[in-house]
Amino acid sequence: MSSRDFSNDLFSINIEENAGCVVSAKVQANPLVTQKCHKEALKTVKKNVVLPGFRKGKAPDNIVESRYSTQMEQELRRLFLRASFEALSQMCDRKPLSPKAVRSSAIDTCNPVNGGSVSFLYEAFPVIPSLPWEQLSLPDPEPVKEISEEDLENGLKNVAYFFATKTPVTRPSQEGDFISLSLYVSKRGDENSTPVAIFENKYFKISEEDMTDSFKARFLNVSTGHRVEEEIGSEDIQSFLNGDLLTFTVNAVIEISSPEMDDEKARQLQAESLEDLKKKLRIQLENQAKEAQHQKRFSDAEDALAQLIDFDLPESLLQEREELLSREKLLNARLVKYCSDSELEEQKQALLEEAKADARKAVKLLFLTQKVFSEKGLSISREELQYMMDVCSRERFGGYPPKDISNEMIQELVLVARDRLTYRKAIEAISSEKKDLEVVPS
C-alpha cells in the first residue's frame, strides 16, 4: 500500500493504492467550493418552488433556505459530491476507470462555511511501466500457404453445393447427409417450465470434419422426428442455462446430391468456363491463405505484447472477463463439443485455468494497446471511424438500425468503434518490423 497527495487552490487529495488497482481517496475541499455548491443548490431549488406573494423563482433566499432546508441539503450534497469526483478525476494520476468504477462514496462533512470532505473507494486505470521494446519476442512471419490441387478440388466441391439437389428423406441418416436440429432446455419435473430454444432448425453435416465423434454418434442412423433427451448433471451448466434437461429434435434428414461442375454451371457463376472458374477460385483461396497468414501474425503480435510486461490489473474487469470466458468455455464443451457430464467434469479445471489466463491476457491487451496507440502516434481517420461505426451498428441492430436512434446510443457506438480501431491499429503496429517499434519514452 502506498500513499500520495495532490493539491491545488481548492482541493487537497490523499490517495492510498492497493492491489487490483483499488484506490481509496480522501478529497478535502475549502469553503470556496462548498459556497459555490450552496449557491448553485439555492438557485436550483428556487427554480422549482412557488411561494404565495412571489413569482416562481423569485422568493427571498432566506425563506427558501428555511422552508426547503431538506431539499437544499440534498442538492448541496449532490453538487459537492460531483465537484469532488471531478477534482479527483482531474488532479489525481490514479483516475477512476469510470463513474461506475466507484465502489463507494461517502460525504464526511459538507458545510458552506467550513468546506467539506468526501471519501471514495474506486478502481483506477492501471499504471503501465515503459515498454521494453528490445525484449519483444515476435516470431518471423510464416509463409503463405500454397494452394494445392486438393485444395482446389475441395473448393470446387463446395461450389457444387450451390447446384446440389437437397432432398428430405424418410430413411435413417447416413454419412454425408445434413440434418436439421432444434435444441431446447427445460426444467425436469416442473410443469410450469416452458422449454427455451437454444437453437432451432440449425443444419449440421454428418461428417468427421463437422462433428465431434460423440455428437456424430447421436445423430447417425436416426430418422426425422427422432428426439434425444439428456439430463444435465453439471451444476455450472444448469445455472448458465436455467434448466437441467436438454431436448434435441431431428426436424429433417436431407440427402445432398452434388453434380459435377462443367462450363455451363461455371457460366452461371459469372465465369467464362470451368477453367476460368478454377482460376478465380484459386485467386479466392490464395486471398484466404493470405488473410489466414495475416490473422496468425496478428495473433502472434497479441501474444508477444501480452508477454512483454506485467502490471497490476483492475480487479473487477479481470473477474468479469474471467466469468464470461469460463461460461463460454464450459458451454462450448457441453453443447458444441458435446462432452458428457463426466467428460466435462474431467476437463473443467483445465478449462477454468484456460479462461483465467485468457482473461488476464485480454484485460492486459485492452490497456497495452491504448499505450502503444499513444506512444506510436497512431490516428483514426473519420472514414475509418464511420466504417467501424456502421459495422458495430449492423452487429447491434441488423441491417436496419432504428431511425430514432438516441444520442446516447450514437455515443456508445462511437466509443466501441474507436476502441476496436485503437486495438487493431496497435496490434498491427506490433506485427510490423521490430525495428519500427522503437519509440521515445514519454
Curated annotation (Swiss-Prot):
It catalyses: [protein]-peptidylproline (omega=180) = [protein]-peptidylproline (omega=0). It comes from the Bacteria. This is Trigger factor. One of its GO terms (molecular function) is peptidyl-prolyl cis-trans isomerase activity. Consists of 3 domains; the N-terminus binds the ribosome, the middle domain has PPIase activity, while the C-terminus has intrinsic chaperone activity on its own. Residues 176-259 form the PPIase FKBP-type domain. HAMAP family: Trigger_factor_Tig. It is found in: Cytoplasm. It comes from Chlamydia trachomatis serovar D (strain ATCC VR-885 / DSM 19411 / UW-3/Cx). InterPro entries: PPIase_dom_sf, Trig_fac, Trigger_fac_C, Trigger_fac_C_sf, Trigger_fac_ribosome-bd_bac, Trigger_fac_ribosome-bd_sf, Trigger_fact/SurA_dom_sf. Belongs to the FKBP-type PPIase family. Tig subfamily. One of its GO terms (biological process) is protein unfolding. Keywords: Cell cycle, Cell division, Chaperone, Cytoplasm, Isomerase, Rotamase.
